[in-house]
Curated annotation (Swiss-Prot):
Organism in which the protein naturally occurs: Bacillus licheniformis (strain ATCC 14580 / DSM 13 / JCM 2505 / CCUG 7422 / NBRC 12200 / NCIMB 9375 / NCTC 10341 / NRRL NRS-1264 / Gibson 46)
Protein name: 6-phospho-5-dehydro-2-deoxy-D-gluconate aldolase
Catalytic activity of the protein: 6-phospho-5-dehydro-2-deoxy-D-gluconate = 3-oxopropanoate + dihydroxyacetone phosphate
Modified residues (Phosphothreonine): T233
Key word Phosphoprotein present: yes
Active site annotation, chain numbering: D85 (proton donor)
Length: 292
């Protein structure tokens, strides 16, 4: 099965008030767990590779070929989006598209809005004729993830409206209080601003840094237009805690499969739980495929 664009998937999710999870991949076994979870839940899924991990994972072509091969070997029948997370430049986004990625995020959020819009327009122009979806970001999500470090800077409503109207993006990540990594204290999301941004942009919104946000707040973000929710830290914590417990009980263990398998199973269960929480379980639909 080829990868699919997330454009139609997110439009469907927004219309029917559920969200599709983006789960970041950290290697072959990790990817396998995400795909297994999606197939068992009959949920569409967004498998994402952070631009800051692309080289660690072997490069754009390696990531694309690995995920495509797993889809074929595992007979995955649900829609799978292969997404570049936090693309650092238009050039990097183009490399991902050329390698077979079906969706990209251009992260110009640390630049002035005019530069952000210019970069985003360049990516949309390249992606659009190739049926590849594009996500952009306004404002700054705080915390640290895959080397991305920063403080929270709320998205400006006017800038959100501008970038949507001037670029033709398919999804918008508007920073409204979420953070990458673990939360220090309770999350403090800007629901009032969220509602207004959803109203003026009228496109699917993306929630970054969703790990650790309580289920009732997640449900509220979905009601307010979020159709894509990004999860990474919760999966990493599940894997790490399980792996640590294995070594604590078996300090002399050295066979990788023996200690990796329980951790990967923990990742899979975390993904399945999130799919149910987001309401995407049972929502697998057919959409446009991107051949690689």
């Amino acid at each position: 099965m080829a990868f699919v664009s997330m454009k139609e998937l997110l439009q469907e999710a927004k219309e029917h008030h559920y969200a599709i999870g983006q789960f970041n991949i950290n290697g072959l076994q990790w990817t396998k767990a995400i795909l297994e979870a999606a197939e068992e839940e009959r949920s569409p899924v967004i498998a994402a590779a952070s631009d800051r991990l692309i080289d660690y994972l072997g490069g754009f072509k390696t990531v694309s070929a690995m995920v495509a091969a797993l889809i074929e070997e595992m007979s995955i029948s649900v829609p799978v989006v292969l997404h570049l997370d936090h693309g650092k430049s238009p050039e990097r986004c183009k490399q991902a598209i050329d390698a077979g990625f079906s969706s990209v995020m251009i992260d110009g959020s640390h630049s002035p809005i005019d530069e952000n819009i210019a970069m985003t327009k360049e990516v949309v122009s390249y992606a659009g004729v190739r049926n590849v979806s594009v996500e952009a970001e306004v404002g700054t999500v705080g915390g640290m993830e895959d080397g991305l470090i920063g403080g929270v800077q709320y998205a400006d409503i006017g800038e959100c409206e501008r970038i949507v109207k001037e670029t033709g993006i398919d999804a918008l990540a508007a920073a409204l209080g979420s953070v990458h990594g673990k939360y220090q204290g309770e999350p403090n999301l800007g629901f009032k601003e969220m509602e207004e941004i959803s109203r003026v942009t009228d496109i699917p919104l993306v929630l970054h840094g969703a790990s650790g946000i309580p289920a009732d707040q997640i449900a509220r973000t979905i009601r307010l237009g979020h159709a894509k929710i990004n999860i990474n830290t919760e999966c990493m914590v599940a894997w790490t805690e399980k792996t640590r417990s294995i070594f604590k009980d078996n300090p002399d263990l050295y066979e990788p499969r023996a200690y990796m398998t329980p951790g990967i199973s923990a990742v899979k269960e975390t993904v399945k739980h999130k799919m149910r929480e987001f309401g995407s379980s049972g929502k697998a639909v057919c959409t446009q495929k991107i051949e690689i």
